[in-house]
Design a protein with these regions (language model features):
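Short, surface-exposed alpha-helical segments at coil->helix boundaries
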Residues: 39-42, 154, 190, 247, ...
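N-terminal Rossmann-like NAD(P)+-binding domain of SDR-like oxidoreductases, especially those catalyzing
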Residues: 1-176, 293, 301, 305-309, ...
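C-terminal substrate-binding subdomain of Rossmann-fold SDR/epimerase-dehydratase oxidoreductases
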Residues: 17, 175, 194-327
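A glycine/serine/threonine-rich, flexible loop-to-helix segment
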Residues: 127-128, 183-191
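Short, conserved catalytic or interaction motifs in soluble domains
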Residues: 36, 179, 240
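Conserved donor sugar-nucleotide recognition element shared by glycan-biosynthetic enzymes
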Residues: 145, 153, 185, 246, ...
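Short, solvent-exposed loop/turn segments at secondary-structure boundaries
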Residues: 85-86, 180-184
Length: 327
């Protein structure tokens, strides 16, 4: 039985990856420091014979006994509301954490896939974004701690591949959504749905003409699964190229939820990208992958998930107390 380590296992995407690899017959070792992750996302796996969990911070030395075939590195604060509060921890996860896991992969002779992001393109001047685009980023801006952590992560991963022969894969993840997203993580989908369910006005930052492309989590997981098992070592975009303005998306949410909220506008945060759309040509050609789930279908599933939350969860403003991690 193949053994796989998944870091960030208690997070939104990490937990779905645990589900997929369990389903595929792997022995899954989950690891998470639970800064932003939630054990509720994986509690259904604890009773399984082929799953184990380590509560551990990957910026510290990582040891896994026994053989290891694959590593998926998905540990990192990923929403602005998190990495603006714990910027140094975010940088350490992308640097020290990635270094530790690459070292583990080298020792175990395991293939490692790291989760990069569309944020490496910054506020892009090229549209849609291909993997060859170098990006338009601000290293010292408010989003820089996340963007640069991921850019460094890609660099050290390729260095380990080139100089140590480590089997590496890099996925650049575009906006992904679905069940288990945190309602209060500051991203547009849970923000809009949460506001609608609480009877609040929907908040748009800027004029609403900025665009995003939303990929349903099952499609994202399928792309990651295929990339891990491919022979391609360079970055690959995985996302849904179906682009929409935030203003139009807000109207879709109002229609989906059957509410009559107003839309209110606030200033656009510094360095917030105005356009974000993946060029997925490589994913199609190399992996035979493309997004299958339409936004209307995926949003219906996601809305039903959020609607099932308790009133207490819907009204909760803060996910975690980060004070012990501010170093």
């Amino acid at each position: 039985m193949k053994r796989i380590l998944i870091t960030g296992a208690a997070g939104f995407l990490g937990s779905h990856l645990c589900d997929r690899f369990i389903k595929e017959g792997y022995y899954v070792i989950g690891m998470d420091n639970l800064i932003t992750g939630d054990l509720k996302n994986i509690e259904h796996l604890f009773k399984l014979e082929h799953f184990e969990f380590y509560h551990h911070d990957i910026t510290k030395f990582v040891h896994i006994p026994g053989d290891l075939d694959y590593i998926l590195h998905f540990a990192s604060p990923a929403s602005p509301i998190d990495y603006l509060k714990i910027p140094i921890q975010t940088l350490k996860v992308g640097s020290l954490g990635t270094h530790n896991l690459l070292g583990l992969a080298r020792v175990k002779k395991a293939r490692i896939l790291i989760a990069s992001t569309s944020e490496v393109y910054g506020d892009p001047l090229v549209h849609p974004q291909t993997e060859e685009y170098y990006g338009n980023v601000n290293t010292i801006g408010p989003r820089g701690v996340y963007d640069e952590a991921k850019r460094f992560q890609e660099s050290i991963t390729m260095a380990y591949h080139t100089f140590h022969g480590v089997e590496t894969r890099i996925v650049r993840i575009f906006n992904t959504y679905g069940p288990r997203m945190r309602l209060n993580d500051g991203r547009v989908i849970p923000a809009f749905i949460g506001q609608a369910l609480r009877g609040e006005d929907l908040t748009i930052f800027g004029d609403g003409m900025q665009t995003r492309s939303f990929c349903y989590v099952d499609d994202q997981v399928e792309g990651i699964f295929r990339l891990l098992h491919s022979d391609y070592v360079y970055p690959v975009n995985i996302g849904n190229p179906d682009e929409i303005t935030i203003k139009d998306f807000a109207e879709e949410i109002i229609k989906l939820t059957g509410t009559n909220q107003k839309v209110v506008y606030h200033p656009l945060p510094v360095n917030d990208p105005l356009q974000r759309q993946p060029d997925t040509t490589k994913a199609k050609e190399l992996l035979g992958w493309e997004a299958k789930v339409s936004r209307s279908e995926g949003m219906k599933i996601t809305y039903d998930y959020f609607r099932s939350l308790s009133k207490e969860e819907l009204s909760k403003e803060e996910h975690k107390d980060f004070s012990s991690y501010i170093k």
